């Protein structure tokens, strides 16, 4: 079996550009500073089967092989290398897990995520996934629409934005404990949507993929999936949701506002400052020689469903 490495699925100029930046920050070799987080931390697959309504895939999208979906990840809390999350994330304890929703709501509530999975009917959604680094997958997520959960807390008329926050637990997330290992980001990881985006029926809170609960490296036990936005908006391992009247400051926008906008909609006409977004490398079943490129679609192919959300916005200014 071909062992996937970062150069297999990231365009060469992006691969070396990112390596250069990481080296300049002293991040290469940072794993050696973390002996407690052993590379032997990988465990056998402990994901559980889920009951859900099947997506019959009317668009006939070709699914990315499961081993690549769970083996090639961005989750800086477990390191900046694509293989690091699968190596280190097994230290994350995902049960019990609570999700707090507060802010501009009539009924602030704390949910047990595993009870929530029984309370709200689960469905499969086969979505395109586009990383800002210009690679893509097709993933069969399992979850429920975010709007169904928000309806339970009754948002007020002042709720204009939704802020999401990842677990902050440095003892199990080495990237939070070591500044270099975690890519120099400020934690906990924070993301946000407009209220209209959050209430859109395509916006999913995922608790599984490929018929089973999420692996820790994929954001277990609950993560956001917004298929028309770049992957960094799809925040993982969520512990808190806050409805706000003002736009929240999000992690990557804070780190590099000229490179990572708040909206982060997939747009082939708006390049990243350091690489083109006009096309993407498709992660498939083969190795380096079989990887293909394809044109990137506006809103990742979901323009018909979501373009109206941005009809009054200049997509170059509000990227």
Curated annotation (Swiss-Prot):
It is found in: Periplasm. One of its GO terms (biological process) is protein repair. The keyword Oxidoreductase applies. Its cofactor is Mo-molybdopterin. It catalyses: L-methionyl-[protein] + a quinone + H2O = L-methionyl-(S)-S-oxide-[protein] + a quinol; L-methionyl-[protein] + a quinone + H2O = L-methionyl-(R)-S-oxide-[protein] + a quinol. Mo-molybdopterin binds at residues 73, 76-77, 131, 166, 218, 223, 234-236. Its EC number is 1.8.5.-. The keyword Signal applies. Binds 1 Mo-molybdopterin (Mo-MPT) cofactor per subunit. Predicted to be exported by the Tat system. The position of the signal peptide cleavage has not been experimentally proven. Keywords: Metal-binding, Molybdenum, Oxidoreductase, Periplasm, Signal. Residues 1-40 form the signal peptide. Pfam families: Oxidored_molyb (PF00174). GO terms for cellular component: periplasmic space. One of its GO terms (molecular function) is metal ion binding. SUPFAM superfamilies: Oxidoreductase molybdopterin-binding domain. It comes from the Bacteria. Heterodimer of a catalytic subunit (MsrP) and a heme-binding subunit (MsrQ). PANTHER family: PROTEIN-METHIONINE-SULFOXIDE REDUCTASE (PTHR43032), PROTEIN-METHIONINE-SULFOXIDE REDUCTASE CATALYTIC SUBUNIT MSRP (PTHR43032:SF3). Belongs to the MsrP family. Part of the MsrPQ system that repairs oxidized periplasmic proteins containing methionine sulfoxide residues (Met-O), using respiratory chain electrons. Thus protects these proteins from oxidative-stress damage caused by reactive species of oxygen and chlorine generated by the host defense mechanisms. MsrPQ is essential for the maintenance of envelope integrity under bleach stress, rescuing a wide series of structurally unrelated periplasmic proteins from methionine oxidation. This is Protein-methionine-sulfoxide reductase catalytic subunit MsrP. It comes from Pasteurella multocida (strain Pm70).
